[in-house]
Curated annotation (Swiss-Prot):
Positions annotated as active site in the UniProt record: D155
Similarity remark: Belongs to the spermidine/spermine synthase family.
Span of domain PABS: 2-235
Any one Pfam family match given in the protein's UniProt record, by short name: Spermine_synth
UniProt KW keywords: Cytoplasm, Polyamine biosynthesis, Spermidine biosynthesis, Transferase
Cellular component, GO annotation: cytosol
Protein name: Polyamine aminopropyltransferase
Domain of life: Bacteria
Cell compartments where the protein resides: Cytoplasm
Catalytic reactions of this protein: S-adenosyl 3-(methylsulfanyl)propylamine + putrescine = S-methyl-5'-thioadenosine + spermidine + H(+)
PROSITE patterns per UniProt: PABS_1, PABS_2
GO molecular function: spermidine synthase activity
C-alpha cells in the first residue's frame, strides 16, 4: 500500500509527498513533532503537520537566511538564531571565520534533540565549540540582552502558535535594542504569493525602526508556492552596496555572490508589497 503525506498550506493549496515511513512522532510540550522519510525529499521535519525542512532542499533556506546578512555586515563576530532548532542556520553561521560565538535560542528542546538524532547533516554544528544552545523563549531572551549581537536571525515557524509573537512590532523593537550599533537582523517572512498582508505589515513595522529595510527572495520547493521571502533590517549596512567581488568562496550549494545581489531584485507584484 502506498503512503502519502499532504500538508494543506492554505484552504485551497497543498503539497503531497509519497512517503516510505514515519521515523518519529510525538507530542511535545509545545507542538506535534514528526520526522518522515519521503521518496522525493528524503527526511522531512514536521511541526503540527507543517513542513519545516527536508534534507533535499534545506540548504536553500539556511544559506539564504544566514549568509546574506553575514556578508552584508562588515565584521560579524556574534550571532543569534531565534528558533531554528534543527540547527541549519547555525551550521551556516559557523562557516564564517569572523564568528566568535553563535547562540541558538529554541523554545522546544525536543526539536533540537530529534534533529540531532534524525537530521545529523542539518544539526551537525550544534556541538561546535563556538555555539551556545539555549532552550527557552526567544522573545524573553532578546529582551534580556541589549546591544550584544552583530547579526540576529529569526528562523521561526509560521506566524501561528509558539511563533506568533516573533512577527510583532514589539519583538522587532526588542531585536533592534539587542543588536549592536551596526547590527543586522533577518526574519523569514513567508510567501509573497499568499501572505501579502503579512509581508506588507512586517515591512512597514521594520521600516519604522531600521534605517535600511530590504526584502529578498529565493526558491524553496517544499514551502508554500515554492517562492519564499526574507525581511532584513539593518542599522548601517545596505546589502545592495555589498562588494560582491570581495565575498570569499565558502562551502554552499545555493548562495553565491551573484545570488546575494540578485535576490533583492523583486518582481513587480512583490515590489508593490513594500511601497
Amino acid at each position: 500500500m502506498e503512503l502519502w503525506f499532504t500538508e494543506y498550506q492554505t484552504p485551497t493549496l497543498g503539497i503531497t509527498c509519497k512517503t516510505k515511513k514515519t521515523l518519529h512522532s510525538e507530542k511535545t510540550e509545545y507542538q506535534e513533532l514528526a520526522v518522515i522519510e519521503t521518496e522525493q525529499f528524503g527526511r522531512m521535519l514536521l511541526l503540527d503537520g507543517i513542513i519545516q525542512t527536508t534534507v533535499a532542499d534545506e540548504f536553500v533556506y539556511h544559506e539564504m537566511i544566514a549568509h546574506v546578512p553575514l556578508f552584508t555586515h562588515k565584521n560579524p563576530k556574534k550571532a543569534l538564531v531565534v528558533g531554528g532548532g534543527d540547527g541549519g542556520s547555525i551550521r551556516e553561521i559557523v562557516k564564517h571565520p569572523s564568528i566568535e560565538k553563535a547562540v541558538l535560542c529554541e523554545i522546544d528542546r525536543r526539536v533540537i534533540e530529534v534533529s540531532k538524532e534524525y537530521l545529523p547533516e542539518i544539526s551537525c554544528a550544534l556541538d561546535n565549540e563556538k555555539v551556545e544552545v539555549v532552550v527557552g523563549d526567544g522573545i524573553k531572551y532578546v529582551k534580556e540582552h541589549k546591544n550584544e549581537f552583530d547579526v540576529i536571525i529569526i528562523d521561526s515557524t509560521d506566524p501561528i502558535g509558539p511563533a506568533e509573537g516573533l512577527f510583532a512590532i514589539d519583538f522587532y523593537r526588542a531585536v533592534y535594542d539587542c543588536l549592536k550599533e551596526d547590527g543586522i537582523f533577518v526574519a523569514q517572512t513567508e510567501s509573497p504569493f499568499i501572505d501579502k498582508e503579512l509581508i506588507t505589515r512586517i515591512i512597514r513595522d521594520v521600516k519604522s525602526l531600521f534605517p535600511i529595510t530590504r526584502l529578498y527572495t529565493c526558491a524553496i520547493p517544499t514551502y508554500p508556492t515554492g517562492y519564499w521571502c526574507f525581511t532584513m533590517g539593518s542599522k548601517k549596512y545596505d546589502p545592495l552596496e555589498t562588494d560582491i567581488d570581495s565575498i570569499p568562496d565558502i562551502d554552499t550549494k545555493y548562495y553565491c555572490p551573484q545570488i546575494h545581489r540578485a535576490a533583492f531584485i523583486l518582481p513587480k507584484f512583490a515590489k508593490e508589497l513594500i511601497k
